[in-house]
């Protein structure tokens, strides 16, 4: 019975992976800090650890800091349902 209880507890525990580190986010949690970006990502500026801030290729960055009235704005992102 003790062996069965030990076995159940062992299976229920989350496995510990050595070398697993926290993913650093950038650009308001829309990007990920990596040494090199993937094929579907574009590098944008740098993170605090001197790695590239990788954003998805479909992301658009507004330099002015305010949302512009184009097809990518929040109001025009989805069609309106009447």
UniProtKB/Swiss-Prot annotation:
Signal peptide stretch: 1-19
Main location: secreted
Sections of the chain in a coiled coil: none
Keyword Translocase: no
Assigned GO CC terms: extracellular region
Positions of disulphide bridges: 26-53, 33-47, 37-54
Localization (cell): Secreted
GO biological process: defense response to Gram-negative bacterium; defense response to Gram-positive bacterium
Superkingdom of the organism of origin: Eukaryota
Matches recorded under Pfam families: Defensin_big (PF14862)
InterPro entries: Defensin_big_dom (IPR028060)
Keywords in alphabetical order: Antibiotic, Antimicrobial, Defensin, Disulfide bond, Secreted, Signal
Protein family according to the UniProt entry: Belongs to the beta-defensin family.
Cited function: Has antibacterial activity.
Name this polypeptide is given: Beta-defensin 119
Lineage, opening ranks: Eukaryota, Metazoa, Chordata, Craniata, Vertebrata
């Amino acid at each position: 019975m003790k062996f069965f209880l030990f076995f159940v507890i062992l299976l229920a525990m989350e496995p510990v992976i050595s070398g697993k580190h926290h993913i650093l986010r950038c650009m308001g949690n829309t990007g990920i800090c990596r040494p090199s970006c993937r094929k579907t990502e574009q590098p944008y500026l740098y993170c605090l650890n001197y790695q590239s801030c990788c954003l998805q290729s479909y992301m658009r960055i507004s330099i002015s800091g305010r949302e512009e009235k184009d097809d990518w704005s929040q109001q025009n992102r989805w069609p309106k349902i009447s």
